[in-house]
Design a protein with these regions (language model features):
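Conserved HGGG/HGGXW glycine-rich cap/lid loop of the alpha/beta-hydrolase fold
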Residues: 2-60, 67
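Structural signature of beta-strand start/N-cap positions in the alpha/beta core
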Residues: 20, 46, 82-84, 105-108
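Conserved acidic catalytic loop of the alpha/beta-hydrolase fold
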Residues: 68-83
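Short glycine-enriched, charge-decorated loop/helix-capping segments at active-site entrances
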Residues: 60-65, 125-127
Length: 139
């Protein structure tokens, strides 16, 4: 696959012979936020953490951050290898989309604090949105 997007920074740790785990950070974060988790896992797994486009050490990107581009970046990081994808927050959405679009590359998915707004049980509004609505529009 040819990747024509921005340069994506990634770092790998652990024995290359071990199963691969890729850590995908959330919005308003970067791969450094996954460093402690990476260090806990890299004794038993090959761990990749990367900065999503526009974050950390990856090429600055003005947006929009569409899901197809985020998944293409993850596929670039995988480089044809099959992995368990661990996603935090928006990174969980990237992990789920990658699993749906590239099941041959995804051995499993673990997500936490991931917004699932398309699910019928997801709250229609957040406390912040409700507070803004209650306060009215600024003049």
């Amino acid at each position: 696959m040819t990747h024509t997007g921005p340069a994506i920074w990634a770092e790998e740790a652990g024995d290359a012979a071990h199963p691969l785990v890729v850590l995908v950070h959330g919005a308003m974060d970067r791969s450094a936020g996954m460093l402690r988790l990476s260090r806990r896992l890299d004794h038993e797994y090959r761990v990749v953490r990367y900065d999503r486009r526009g974050y950390g050490r990856s090429t600055p990107h003005g947006g929009p951050f569409d899901m197809a581009a985020q998944v293409a970046d993850l596929v670039q990081v995988l480089a044809g290898r099959r992995a368990v994808i661990v996603g935090h927050s928006y990174g969980g959405n990237v992990a789920l989309a990658a699993a749906q679009l590239h099941p041959h590359l995804v051995a499993g998915v673990a997500i936490y604090e991931t917004p699932l707004s398309w699910e019928p049980w997801w709250p229609g509004t957040t406390a912040g949105a409700s507070a803004i609505k209650a306060a009215g529009r600024p003049h």
